[in-house]
Every structure is written in C-alpha cells, then in structure tokens.
Amino acid sequence: MTETIYSGLKQLGGATLLPESPDKAELERVRNPQADVAYNVRFTAPEFTSLCPMTGQPDFAHLVIDYVPGEWLVESKSLKLYLGSFRNHGAFHEDCTVSIGRRLAGFLAPRWLRIGGYWYPRGGMPIDVFWQTGPMPEGVWIPDQDVPPYRGRG
C-alpha cells in the first residue's frame, strides 16, 4: 500500500467511541500539503457542552477556532471527538476555552491560532472567552467570528 499523508490515522473512516475525558482524547494530524501558503482554517462548534465543576449542570457554548497552519492540519474527526469529550468534563468556561486553544497550538505548532468561546448564560450572564497565540498574521484573510452578543429573548 502506498504511504499517503493520511497513513497512520486511527479514527477516520471507522466507528470510534467518544473519549471519556479531554485528557484521554487523541488528537490526530496530517501533513499540510499547502504548507508553503498562509491561509486560515476555521472550525465552528455551535453545540459545545461541558459541565459546571461546582454543580455538575451542563454548560453550553458556541466555539469558533481559527488557525493558520504550518506543517500540520488537525484531522477533523479527532477534533470533533476531542471537543465531544468535554461533555462529561467539569471545568469553568475560561479553563475549557483556553485549554482547547493551548492543546491545539501545542499539538499543531500553527503559525497562529485563536479560539472564541461564546458561552450561553448561567446565572443570567453570558461569559465570552478569547485566546490567541499572538498577533494576527498579515496578508491572511481571517474573517470576524460574527457570533452576535447574547440578547436573550429581546
């Protein structure tokens, strides 16, 4: 069999159970065939869930992850499973958002990465969390995240 950039992936193309926790989730990556070009990749997770570490109640967020890849691309199914592993994980909004960004940045070594966590209200107040690796790169089209502020029923 011919070796490809997809060789070695374990989760893509088959049934895979949701990891028990973010620490047990296995991210996978593939070589970027366009590594000589600076471009933006966006992942949106509009139904992200985790648990409040104090009450065990579910928390919900709309996550937007932008990154300008270097040598590596995250394999999207592994990212989906990693994000899904937070479903039974207790952590505050800030910790969830920043830890996702830091893990992806450490794993992929992108030219740049940012994450916006737009958390739905708990206690009547939405919490939005933003993290990025450094200044936005020049010459790359990086659209606004365009997640409107929470308005409730108004």
Swiss-Prot record:
Keyword NADP (UniProt): yes
Enzyme Commission designation: 1.7.1.13
A GO molecular function held by the record: preQ1 synthase activity
Gene Ontology BP annotations: queuosine biosynthetic process; tRNA modification
A cellular-component GO term for this protein: cytoplasm
Family: Belongs to the GTP cyclohydrolase I family. QueF type 1 subfamily.
Protein name per its UniProtKB record: NADPH-dependent 7-cyano-7-deazaguanine reductase
The gene coding this protein: queF
